Amino acid sequence: MMQRGESLITRARNNCVAKFLENKEWTHLFWIDSDIGFSPDSFYRLLLADKDVVAGVYPLKRENWPEAGLPAGMTQADFERMYTSYTVNTNDKNENGEIVLKVDEEGFMKVHDAPTGFMVIKRSVFEKMMAAYPELNYISDSDYNREDKGLH
């Protein structure tokens, strides 16, 4: 399912979730933003991970240029490795207060929030949220004739 011409990303995602929930045979919702590059292997890795929510890591759209300038002879690969920020946020810190990335044997890690540009969510997550938070029932403000089907 594609969302085109929607300038408000939150509304576009909410409309996608509502459409997803209308189709009972769909088991996973996979967000892939149009500006995210990924390999087919990465796609299948997330889809088959059997996690309630799982997201791929990708670079933020900014570089952290060093204040002193670039070292002589630096290659693009060196620059990307040293100065690119990624969409990883965790609260895990060691005794010195330094952030520690705890990666499991499958190459995944728990985070306190994750980017939605390359993310898979199981249907059961939405069903649990609907049961726990019925007051968050979603009605699109972009489709005034849309029937309220009780979907979030």
Kindly give the residue locations of the regions a language model identified.
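Alpha-helix termini
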Residues: 20-26, 133
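Short beta-strand-to-loop acidic/aromatic patch adjacent to the donor-nucleotide binding site
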Residues: 24-37
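Short, conserved alpha-helix that lines the donor NDP-sugar binding/gating region
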Residues: 9-22
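Residue-level detector of alpha-helix boundaries and kinks
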Residues: 1-2, 106
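Glycine-/small-residue-rich active-site loops that bind phosphorylated ligands and cofactors
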Residues: 8, 37-38
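Short beta->alpha junction loops
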Residues: 2-9
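Conserved catalytic core of nucleotide-sugar-dependent glycosyltransferases
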Residues: 17, 39-151
